[in-house]
């Protein structure tokens, strides 16, 4: 396997260059070429002597970029990339543009073990977790494909980030320090893994010096019974325990928790569900992000009507819960929330 340089800090690259018998400035050049100029391989870094570049490649060292397999653009300009890893696995990442920002939805694993019924990613199971450079590459690949600097990052692609917390936190450090994306513009989404939330804040403080990224917890139901129907792994994490761990995260970091809630027509979208949800999450600083269901082939769930969605939102609002509705982006290219999977679609835009 290639020894990847992507994902390393400026200090680490400088130390690495010195260990290779080079001057410290070579490490600074390497950092600039990898992060600012977007070098895909050592061959691109023309300021380095050819003999040294060749020797490094011979020794199994390279930048560590992924290969773009497919590139599709939705009618709303949302861009989905299918990327291939060195061992032949594939992952998807999505660039979501607006006039003011470019959000990159990154994957943290190849596949996902959580098997949420409404999500396409979990249908294929988990292959492995991604390494730090494979996570960071997704942001660089979207920047390259869309010719625009990403402003926000959401760990809402393939995989459960808290089952790969070490690589995810190191990727956050890299995105923050090396690509200049503020932690407050980074969101880490989790469906909830027992014992990981209490550790996350402490680990982030150790690894990052602070924990300023947003934690988004996927609830998708107002009670334990319904949550277990939608999320098979929820049986191991009682609803009350999950909320208590969210309160602990808030106490340690001072950062409010965002709760994700996918609305499924006739299943969890009734006014009584909204009232019950308000009773559960209204007791501490939080925010509810409503997401209308995005269809996948394997399930027959229905997307609620706009009227039903608005009624649900109003119940939460009247009960004092901060709430917003996430717009679905990239639907016509299966690039919306819950639709990512490891597959190549018919050609759309050449890579």
UniProtKB/Swiss-Prot annotation:
The protein's required cofactors = [4Fe-4S] cluster
Query: Which residues of this protein are catalytic?
Result: 92 (proton acceptor), 337 (s-methylcysteine intermediate)
Residues binding [4Fe-4S] cluster, per UniProt:
112, 116, 119
Q: Where does S-adenosyl-L-methionine bind?
A: 159-160, 189, 218-220, 294
Q: Which GO terms describe its molecular function?
A: 4 iron, 4 sulfur cluster binding; metal ion binding; rRNA (adenine(2503)-C2-)-methyltransferase activity; rRNA binding; tRNA (adenine(37)-C2)-methyltransferase activity; tRNA binding
User: Which Pfam families did the record assign?
Assistant: Radical_SAM, RlmN_N
What domain of life is recorded for the organism? Bacteria
- E.C. no: 2.1.1.192
The protein's location, in the record's own words, is: Cytoplasm
Disulfide connectivity?
105-337
What is written in the cofactor note of this entry? Binds 1 [4Fe-4S] cluster. The cluster is coordinated with 3 cysteines and an exchangeable S-adenosyl-L-methionine.
Question: Which Gene3D superfamilies has this protein been placed in?
Answer: 1.10.150.530, Aldolase class I
Keywords from UniProt, A to Z, are: 4Fe-4S, Cytoplasm, Disulfide bond, Iron, Iron-sulfur, Metal-binding, Methyltransferase, rRNA processing, S-adenosyl-L-methionine, Transferase, tRNA processing
Which GO terms are recorded in the biological process aspect for this UniProt protein?
A: rRNA base methylation; tRNA methylation
Q: Which GO terms describe its cellular component?
A: cytoplasm
Role noted for this protein: Specifically methylates position 2 of adenine 2503 in 23S rRNA and position 2 of adenine 37 in tRNAs.
NCBIfam families (alphabetical): rRNA_mod_RlmN
Family of this protein:
Belongs to the radical SAM superfamily. RlmN family.
Kindly give the PANTHER family that the UniProt entry links to this protein: 23S RRNA METHYLTRANSFERASE, RADICAL SAM CORE DOMAIN-CONTAINING PROTEIN
State what protein this is by name: Probable dual-specificity RNA methyltransferase RlmN
Q: Which source organism?
A: Synechococcus sp. (strain CC9605)
